[in-house]
Structures are given as C-alpha cells and as structure tokens.
Amino acid sequence: MSVSLVLCTWGGAARTARVYRVVKQAMIRTMFVRLRSAGQVRYQSSFSFPSSQSLLQKGQLGKKKRSVRKLGLGISDKKQYNSGVTSAAQEAGGAVRDLKSEKAQTKKKVYDYSTLPRVEQISDTKLKNMSTEVLYSGYRPLFFDVEPKNSQEGKTLYEFAMKLEEFQEAMSPWVSSATGSEMYAEWDNVPGDVIKDLKPFTPPVVNSRKLNGATGENANDFDEQGNFQKKAFFDKVQSILNRNGKGGRKRPGVTVLKHLKKLKEQN
C-alpha cells in the first residue's frame, strides 16, 4: 500500500500502474527463488581448487602474467617470470618422467649381434672325435673321461696316453724353440745321430805359460819366478800394514796400490 502511494505521488496513473507491475514481478521472482532453493539439497563434491594441481598451475601462471602487464617489464624480465612459472610445472611433471624412465629401464634390452662373426654349430661334434684329434696332435689328452675304460690289455686309456711320453725320444734343444712350439727347418737335413752328439761350445781354459810362450823347463822357471814375486809382494804389504804410524806422513793404502801396479807391469 505504501509503495502504491509513493508511486502515485511520483507520476501519473498509467506510469504508476506500469512500475507497480514491474516491482510486483520482481518480488514474485525473488520469493520463487527462495522457495526453490529452500526445497533443494546441495551436495558438495570432494573436488576443490587447492586439491587440483593443474588449476593451481594455471592460477599461478595467470597471476604472473597479470603482474608482468601491470609492471610493464621488458622482454628479459618476462623470460625470468616465465621461467619461474614453468619451473613449478616442471617439478610437477618430474615425478611422471621418473616413472616413465624406471619403466623403460626395467624393459628387456635387445642387442644386435649381427655384426659379430658366426661360429660353426657343434651339434655334430662328438667327444670321441675331439679326444682322438688331441691324442694324435702330440698333446696330452685332456678330454678323456675320468671313468675307467678298460682296454684289451686291462689298462685304462688314460694310463696308455700317459705312457706314450716314455717312448718318445728326448728332443734336442737345437731343433725347436725353448717352448717346443716352433720347429726350425734348417735342421731337417742333419742326421739324428749328429744332432744327439752336439754339445754347447765351452771356451777352453788358457794357461798363462802358453800365452807367454814358455814351454818345458822354461815354463817351470816362469812359475817359480811368479811365485817368488807374489811372495815378495805379500811380504811387502804386510810390513807396510805393520808399521803402526812409523812411516811418517805416507799412507799405507797408496803404497800398497803402487806395489800392486808395479807387480802387474812386471808380469
């Protein structure tokens, strides 16, 4: 009633009726909305803004862009701001990349061996053939089984192979190398008896009398003279060492060396 009186005083009758209808409709709408909201139950979901990482990143990115626009920064400053924003996204995606890398490492690696040389198959190779080849090649057989295999003579095959070395002749050191792996072909034309009798060269002992040309009685005289000189030399050395400081400033060692040099010159 009060609203209608105010409207009547404000304008004409037609205008008052039109405004009254608009106000009435607005009041009816508000009452209807209130009644409708009072009769409904609002269900709140577990999804919220702080729990969503993507929404947080978008919000941070928007804040950074707005702050850059307000401050009017340059290109370099914008790059720094963008790098700070993207670092948060990189940290969030780091966990996902770690999981992917772990899965990639756990996968079985496939190697390509096509470039390597191929080896012949050993499906057709037998142990008997290998043992026979090793036996006749000159080496001690290593592929025989340890289990006893009796032959016609009642001896094992392993003992027979070990006794083959007893019948083998001792190899001359001139024919082969020290390890026996290399044979010298220049000895093929030399008879075996000659090779057996060969001995290493030992230089003969040369007598000092023959070097000086002394023979017969002169040789004996030469020996006596040498012994006399040696005896005289040792007597002289002994007398020098027994002087006990009576020789003045002379050094006994120098005197002995001089006598030794003189003896060598005489011989």
UniProtKB/Swiss-Prot annotation:
Keywords: Mitochondrion, Transit peptide. Residues 246-267 have a biased composition (Basic residues). InterPro entries: Pet20-like (IPR014804). Residues 243-267 are annotated as: Disordered. It is found in: Mitochondrion. Signal peptide: none annotated. This is Protein PET20, mitochondrial. The lineage of its organism: Eukaryota, Fungi, Dikarya, Ascomycota, Saccharomycotina. The gene is PET20.
